[in-house]
UniProtKB/Swiss-Prot annotation:
Lineage: Bacteria, Pseudomonadati, Pseudomonadota, Gammaproteobacteria, Alteromonadales
One GO-annotated biological process of the protein: translation
Entry function: One of two assembly initiator proteins, it binds directly to the 5'-end of the 23S rRNA, where it nucleates assembly of the 50S subunit. One of the proteins that surrounds the polypeptide exit tunnel on the outside of the subunit.
Record-level GO cellular component terms: ribonucleoprotein complex; ribosome
PANTHER family documented for this protein: MITOCHONDRIAL RIBOSOMAL PROTEIN L24
GO molecular function: rRNA binding; structural constituent of ribosome
InterPro entries the record matches: KOW (IPR005824), Rib_uL2_dom2 (IPR014722), Ribosomal_uL24 (IPR003256), Ribosomal_uL24_CS (IPR005825), Ribosomal_uL24_KOW (IPR041988), Translation_prot_SH3-like_sf (IPR008991)
Classification via SMART domains: KOW (SM00739)
Any Pfam family hit: KOW
Keyword vocabulary terms for this entry: Ribonucleoprotein, Ribosomal protein, RNA-binding, rRNA-binding
SS bonds (residue pairs): none
Name of this protein: Large ribosomal subunit protein uL24
Subunit details: Part of the 50S ribosomal subunit.
Chain's gene name: rplX
Length: 104
């Protein structure tokens, strides 16, 4: 099945501590989760590793968020939207359900 949300898509968080935030998807994981820039930040306690030149300390990083908790942002309507698929010229393309415009 083709992915409704892909890398570089702008999404709106629908649930969780970052509800309402708008950001870009930086990575899509095969487990049905996404890593979204600046969303779901967690603090990781990192050990120093002198061989790799990594300093120790508390590092803030993005944790994966469930794909069902985000919706793609439609810039034409200014709201979160759903995505559908259709064939155009023999190619499968994504479109917004609210206004039938193609997703860029």
């Amino acid at each position: 099945m083709a992915a409704k949300i892909r890398r570089e898509d702008e999404v709106v968080v629908l649930a969780g501590k970052d509800k309402g935030k708008r950001a870009k998807v930086s990575q899509v994981l095969p487990t049905g989760k996404l890593i979204v820039e600046g969303v779901n930040l967690v603090k990781k306690h990192q050990k120093p590793n002198p061989q790799l030149g990594v300093a120790g300390g508390i590092v803030e990083q993005e944790a994966p968020i469930q794909a069902s908790n985000v919706a793609i942002f439609n810039s034409a309507t200014g709201k979160a939207d759903r995505v559908g698929f259709r064939l155009e010229d023999g190619k499968k393309v994504r479109f917004f359900k609210s206004n039938s415009e193609l997703v860029k």
